[in-house]
């Protein structure tokens, strides 16, 4: 009789979890946890069966989650990062997030750690994440360029430092050839004729690193000092391992020790980036060299630490935070244009932004010491 009255009461109205709770003699929270299989609390078999039986008898169905995919898309940007141990990438993220927050967007950061496997996994996740845009803070791996070009037909992509890559997507660019030349010209103007250049692995995957070195070598070559540059790059295995928090610093430190042991006539050492330059400085300090009196040192990126008085690192400014903001602005423009029609057709545009690299001369470079 009780069961009949229960059924009658449900006629003409939607059954709720509260109805199931009353029928089963349990709390509404218990109904929710049991039916959603969230056993945060240990329920007896008898309670589980009672709840399930009541739900079935009353014809109760769990409410389908209304996924407003478009509203989700309007709030999410995905950012690919090769590592988070270098302040350069943190600065880029800061610029991206500052602009995204202004526009009401959140970020999903994919730290690939320069792993092809991780990069592929994250790319395949894009369909489920359903972002409104994707930003790469470095060049994508070459083996995924076709995939990215295909994805960019439906999701706006912006790539930072994409110059010279054959990829038709929006980009915030850096001319690494020019940057390398600026570094070399500064040292040549100070009379340095024998210098060392320390870099992470110079592989096909990391083409932009090689471009920076190439520009440096060209400037020395045109000055008649083609043999005046010693290139020291880390083993390729460095990029295949998960980067340690001090991996780039260690590259600078360890390879400087090798330079000092093998090339006693060097008067300046250049790091491909500031993190490597910090390692160079510490290695010189440990070997009792005075900077810049005995050895000049340069870095690149003008990160926060390079400005500290005790370091005062000569470096290259290429406006990292601004580049992050610009990449985000490009995505916002693409989103806006996708929501607008120009007559009967959809406009297609490719944005390219480039900043001129500039030298910031501080206390680690000076005139070459006569040896």
Annotate each language-model stretch with its function:
Residues 5-16, 55-88, 92, 103, ...:
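N-terminal helix-turn-helix/winged-helix DNA-binding helices
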Residues 101-111, 217-249:
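Short beta-strand elements in bilobed, periplasmic/extracellular small-molecule ligand-binding domains
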Residues 257-371:
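Flexible loop/turn connectors
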Residues 23, 28-33, 69-84, 195-202:
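Short beta-strand segments enriched in small/hydrophobic residues
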Residues 20-22, 51, 295, 359:
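Append "Primarily bacterial transcriptional regulators
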Residues 183-225, 344-364:
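An alpha-beta-alpha
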Residues 170-198, 214, 218, 249-258, ...:
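Hydrophobic alpha-helical segments within soluble ligand-binding/sensing domains
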Residues 137-182, 198-202, 275, 301-313:
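Flexible loop/hinge segments that line or gate small-molecule binding clefts
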């Amino acid at each position: 009789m009780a069961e009949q009255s229960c059924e009658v009461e449900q006629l003409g109205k939607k059954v709720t979890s509260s109805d199931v709770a009353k029928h089963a003699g349990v709390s509404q929270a218990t109904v929710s946890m049991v039916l959603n299989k969230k056993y945060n609390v240990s329920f007896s078999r008898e309670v589980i069966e009672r709840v399930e039986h009541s739900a079935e008898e009353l014809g109760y169905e769990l409410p389908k989650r209304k996924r407003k995919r478009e509203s989700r898309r309007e709030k999410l940007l995905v950012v690919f990062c090769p590592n988070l141990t270098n302040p350069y990438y943190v600065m880029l993220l800061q610029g991206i997030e500052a602009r995204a927050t202004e526009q009401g967007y959140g970020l999903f950061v994919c730290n690939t750690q320069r792993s092809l496997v991780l990069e592929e996994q994250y790319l395949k996740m894009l369909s489920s994440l359903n972002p409104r845009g994707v930003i790469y803070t470095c060049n994508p791996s070459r083996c995924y360029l076709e995939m990215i070009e295909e994805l960019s037909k439906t999701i706006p992509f912006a790539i930072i430092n994409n110059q010279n890559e054959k990829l038709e997507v929006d980009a915030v660019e850096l001319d690494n050839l020019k940057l390398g030349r600026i570094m070399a010209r500064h040292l040549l103007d100070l009379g340095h004729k024998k210098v060392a250049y320390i870099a992470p692995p110079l592989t096909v995957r990391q083409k932009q690193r090689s471009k920076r070195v190439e520009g440096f070598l060209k400037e020395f070559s045109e000055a008649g000092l083609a043999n005046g540059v010693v290139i020291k790059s880390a083993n390729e295995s460095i990029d295949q391992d998960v980067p340690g928090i001090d991996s780039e610093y260690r590259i600078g430190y360890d390879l400087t020790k090798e330079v000092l042991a093998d090339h006693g006539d060097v008067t300046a050492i250049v790091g491909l980036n500031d993190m490597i330059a910090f390692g160079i400085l510490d290695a010189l300090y440990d070997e009792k060299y005075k900077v810049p009196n005995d050895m000049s040192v340069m870095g690149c990126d003008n990160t926060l630490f390079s400005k500290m008085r005790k370091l005062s690192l000569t470096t290259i400014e290429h406006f990292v935070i601004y580049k992050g903001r610009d990449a985000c602005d490009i995505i916002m423009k693409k989103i806006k244009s996708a929501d607008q029609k120009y007559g009967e057709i959809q406009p297609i545009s490719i944005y390219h932004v480039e900043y001129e690299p500039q030298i910031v001369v501080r206390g680690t470079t000076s005139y070459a010491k006569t040896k």
